[in-house]
């Protein structure tokens, strides 16, 4: 299994904090966001880690060196991560976890996702419905919709982490190919939403309140800094 971390964007909603530094390299306690995430993947046996970089790509390479692999995406100013992920579609060929680059979470979240069955498994949190991140609708073991769901109909939130096996990768590639012309502002999850709304099986892993945060704004970053000590108590996975 490999991990692909989508880290090409500018993080403009975090300005001025991210004017000269990618948000994945912001500090949470003694580690950067991505130092922590990469360590967590490795602790759970995922050693093939690919960073998709764009904005300030040289800072990532100086920071991580040969610790990870890199692919560069140059059009980060004009597109969202649907196009970022499509630019490395040749990497979607076997078991893979795709992660946003701004996640702070407990080890158990990744562990639960790895253990969850299904060709496509989206990590969601049904313990709350947040306004400023992707919302989902679920029923039993299947995902019904993602992103376009109204708060009233939402079951919870997508946390920015998903797993695909080889068949799931083929389905993802097929779904992205159908929408890649245009849709410059969309996330790759549009392809997942189209699948689920058409009745195709998309599974989900419910982390159900295990601590996680996605950092998109200065307010969210400040809030995570206030509770950073809570992320130091990761549950040990045997």
Task: Annotate each PLM feature.
Residues 1-18:
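N-terminal nucleotide-binding beta1-loop-alpha1 segment
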Residues 2-5, 27, 31-95:
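Conserved N-terminal catalytic core of the sugar/cofactor nucleotidyltransferase
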Residues 9, 102, 217:
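Active-site glycine-centered loops adjacent to acidic/histidine catalytic or metal-binding residues
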Residues 13, 59-62, 108, 171, ...:
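Phosphate- and divalent-cation-binding pockets in alpha/beta enzyme and binding domains
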Residues 24, 67-69, 201-203:
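Conserved beta-strand segments of alpha/beta enzyme cores
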Residues 25, 136-138, 204:
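A structural signal for short hydrophobic beta-strand segments in well-ordered beta-sheet cores
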Residues 62-134, 140, 166-167:
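Conserved beta-loop-beta/alpha segment of the NTase-like Rossmann-fold superfamily
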Residues 114, 144-212, 219-222, 226-237:
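Catalytic-core segments of class I nucleotidyltransferases/pyrophosphorylases
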